[in-house]
């Protein structure tokens, strides 16, 4: 069909839009198309690479973080992976006016209809996510509503960055902030309102310590070979 012929392998949005406009005489704007597709991609949570949907574990936490990064999740203080609606944003503005108010225009322009999280919300959202229903259910699966510093304080296995083990799914911490180590020297973190969920080199950031998330199981990668 004409529509199918517009698609090509590893095709950029601008080329696809140009092909569709040429085939159908439309006048689709590339940025409008990109924004729509971003919202579609952001809403989907990819669990296809999870090793065990029945437990909350470090390897699936990594996959959760990678999915959030690939989907370009945004950042809104006090959120934990929900799709940002007008009602949710207004509720958060009332709850955290000083933290969110200065960024309200930016958030409305960039994140409505997109999944968002703050730094610790990215971690809590994984534990609260129900893989059967696709819902994020607050306070479930033994994960309390803690802050970044509380998470680090409550961890029983932790240390300075010089002692950090090579374990995907451990957490990296600095006062007031936390991220997810994904391996090979990189972490994924909800960095801030203007940045969203990003992938960063651990050595390039000012992390002060690491810890194991005390509310999930830790699986050695060798234990899941063949799954």
Where are the regions a protein language model picked out?
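Loop/turn positions that initiate beta-strands
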Residues: 167-170
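A conserved glycine-rich beta-strand in the N-terminal activation segment of trypsin-fold
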Residues: 178-182
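Active-site or metal-binding loop neighborhoods of secreted/extracellular toxin and effector enzymes
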Residues: 187-227
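Short, basic/aromatic beta-hairpin or loop at an interaction surface
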Residues: 132-153
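N-terminal capping segments
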Residues: 2-135, 175-177, 188-193, 226
